[in-house]
Regions:
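Bacterial N-terminal signal peptides that target proteins for export
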Residues: 2-12
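Bacterial N-terminal signal peptides
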Residues: 10-21
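Stable alpha-helical elements in mature extracytoplasmic
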Residues: 36, 48, 112, 128, ...
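Mid-length scaffold segments of soluble, non-membrane domains
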Residues: 109-115, 119-126
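Glycine-rich, acidic and aromatic/proline-enriched surface loops and short helix-turn segments
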Residues: 134-142
Length: 199
């Protein structure tokens, strides 16, 4: 009877140690994930991702990022901006952007900042970490039909280490999902259709 009780105590101690060890591993992992997301946030700030992918609101005399629409891209419910045809096309090295700083026109065509929130229908919610990193490595849009367009500095971003891009992905998964379907960008090779698209 004493022998069985000793075994029970020993088993309890071993089980307790396993639980404590596992809890510590989980806590360290959670802390590590938080640190990775913090690193990703810092990278998005350094590269100005939040400024180009967040619509602006007026605050006094200044345009500031709308905190309710962080990383949600060009507002899909806005009327498409009118860009003068003289800035679109080869050798026309001028550009314009809208007040929201989420729509851009220039020699590359017309581009709209993407929705980078984790919304599953209109953002990157269904995009895997692997695909996210691949898109930024090779500069191909997620629909695989075209390259990422200016002024997105994807060539500079592609030089980041994969771990840095993974950190950005982990951070973006923590921001508030915003349902916002961004208009399709129009590459230069489609510039003959721009007038129709802007009507």
């Amino acid at each position: 009877m004493i022998y069985i009780r000793k075994l029970s105590i020993l088993f309890g101690l071993v089980f307790g140690l396993i639980v404590i060890t596992f809890s510590n591993i989980v806590a360290e992992q959670q802390e590590s994930n938080a640190e990775i997301a913090d690193k990703g946030k810092l990278i998005t700030e350094i590269y100005g991702c939040v400024d180009c992918h967040t619509p602006k609101i007026k605050e006094g005399e200044f345009l500031v990022n709308d905190p309710d629409r962080l990383f949600s891209g060009h507002p899909g419910d806005n009327k498409l901006p009118q860009f003068p045809p003289e800035i679109i096309g080869p050798e026309k090295w001028r550009g314009l952007f809208t007040d929201s700083m989420t729509a851009w026109g220039g020699p590359w065509g017309i581009s709209y900042s993407a929705n980078l929130t984790p919304d599953k229908k209109t953002g990157i919610g269904k995009l895997s970490e692997k695909n996210f990193v691949s898109i930024l490595n090779i500069g191909i849009h997620s629909n695989m039909n075209r390259k990422l367009m200016e002024p997105m500095p994807w060539k500079e971003i592609s030089e980041l280490k994969d771990d840095d891009l993974k950190a950005v992905y982990q951070y973006l998964k923590t921001v508030k999902p915003v349902k916002n379907k961004v208009p399709e960008s129009v590459p230069l090779h489609n510039h003959e259709n721009l007038a129709q698209i802007q009507d």
